[in-house]
Swiss-Prot record:
Any Pfam family: PUA
UniProt cross-references to SMART domains, sorted A to Z: PUA (SM00359)
Chief place where the protein resides: cytoplasm
Protein name, as recorded: Glutamate 5-kinase
Pathway participation: Amino-acid biosynthesis; L-proline biosynthesis; L-glutamate 5-semialdehyde from L-glutamate: step 1/2
Function, as annotated: Catalyzes the transfer of a phosphate group to glutamate to form L-glutamate 5-phosphate.
Similarity annotation: Belongs to the glutamate 5-kinase family.
UniProt entry tagged with the keyword Kinase: yes
Keywords: Amino-acid biosynthesis, ATP-binding, Cytoplasm, Kinase, Nucleotide-binding, Proline biosynthesis, Transferase
GO molecular function: ATP binding; glutamate 5-kinase activity; RNA binding
Binding locations of substrate: 64, 149, 161
EC annotation from Swiss-Prot or TrEMBL: 2.7.2.11
Any GO BP annotation: L-proline biosynthetic process
Length: 384
């Protein structure tokens, strides 16, 4: 076996501008040799996060390490058939330690967000998760996301935090996914075993060959290897998001990231973020029913790219639910309804009927609750 080639084998390359990103940090960068968590590598990553937040950008951290932290708090558990229950118990014990580790580096609040598979496949939970993360970013906090191992079951697990990071990146409409690992980037073969491994500093299109040559996890504390990172890059790329693989153990490499310089692997997306989202909005199944709007609202949507507010709504047809994909149609006394747009609705049909024609500030009074000022946000809408 040979050592891993030095980071200098990866040429330095510029990172395109971004305004919102996800940083994924694996257990191998946070676990201490004797058990528990270590700030050794987390400190440089925290500096990277702080520098970008100070510059006006937004970041979400997806962090592993709860199980590793929990393992250090109690005597070693015996091997048994209750492996899942044991892991869930360790995650419950270690989650507070993990959040405390990150909080110590920042003078802003750190918010803990635990997600499950169900949260991301259910329309209403998906919308709620997205709204929560966006609001946390708007408030200037630092969200730290982890899979909720305490309640997840095997058949409903997201599987690893690499894939969770890609899903979160799409959830918040990020432009970049940074994956900190313990290897310098992607190689033509596993550099731990092959001295002739060549660095791949840029990948335009991920191929089955790339996935095949990616090694499995060699860490004793994590669940994801290079293959899961490439699978995550595929997910992110389908949403128009760049993925950057880099060595989180190298201070020079991490400091370079703060100056928008990468020594690692950049994996390009398969389309632009706007194209990916607009394609999905245009082709996703539409629920029966529609929202009928007046001419003023139609002009605001078509000419100004505005969100749909309750003031321009005439009525709602059908029995759609919050989070459904619905049609938006114009209606006037002289013309029948004509489809104008489609989008993800923030309120149910019953709620829309109650707030139709009112000002956004009156939603709370009329309903007793609010999901925001818009019925369909412009980011969730596409013109037909």
């Amino acid at each position: 076996m040979t050592g891993i080639p030095p980071p200098s084998r990866f040429p330095e390359q510029p990172i395109p501008p971004w305004r919102r990103a996800v940083l994924k940090v694996g257990s191998s960068l946070l676990a201490a040799d004797g058990g528990g968590l270590s700030p050794r590598f987390a400190l440089d990553l925290a500096h990277f996060v702080s520098a970008n937040i100070t510059a006006g950008r937004q970041l979400v951290i997806v962090s592993s390490g709860a199980v590793a932290a929990g393992r250090a708090l109690i005597p070693p558990l015996p091997e048994s058939g209750g492996a899942l229950a044991a892991r869930q118990a360790l995650a419950a014990l270690g989650q507070a330690q993990l959040i405390a580790l990150w909080q110590r580096f920042f003078d802003r609040p750190v918010a803990q967000v635990l997600l499950t598979h169900d949260d991301l496949r259910n329309r209403r939970r998906y919308l709620n998760a997205r709204a929560t993360l966006r609001e946390l970013l708007h408030l200037g906090t630092l969200p730290v996301v982890n899979e909720n191992d305490t309640v997840s079951v095997d058949e409903l697990k997201l599987g690893d935090n690499d894939n969770l990071a890609a899903i979160v990146a799409a959830l918040i409409d990020a432009q970049a996914l940074f994956i900190a690992t313990d290897i310098d980037g992607l190689y033509t073969t596993d550099p731990r075993h092959h001295s002739d491994a060549q660095p791949l500093h840029e990948v335009r299109t991920l191929t089955p060959e790339n996935l095949a040559m990616a090694g499995d996890s060699s860490s004793t504390v994590g669940t994801g290897g290079m293959r899961t990172k490439l699978e995550a890059a595929l997910k992110a790329g389908a949403a128009g998001i760049d993925t950057y693989l880099f060595n989180g153990r190298s201070s020079d490499v991490v400091r370079g990231l703060a100056q928008h310089r990468l020594r690692g692997t950049r994996i390009h997306p398969t389309c632009t973020p706007i194209a990916a989202r607009k394609y999905w909005l245009r082709h996703a199944p539409v629920e029966p029913g529609a929202i009928l709007i007046d001419a003023g609202a139609a002009a605001a949507l078509a000419q100004q790219g505005a969100s749909l507010l309750p003031g321009g709504v005439l009525s709602a047809e059908g029995d759609f639910r919050r989070g459904d994909m619905i049609q938006i149609a114009t209606r006037s006394p002289d013309h029948p309804s004509h489809p104008l747009a489609r989008g993800l609705v923030q309120y149910s049909a019953a709620d829309v009927r109650r707030i139709a024609g009112c000002h956004s500030r009156d939603i709370q009074t009329l309903l007793g609750y609010t999901y925001g000022d818009t019925i369909v946000h412009r980011d969730d809408l596409v013109l037909l």
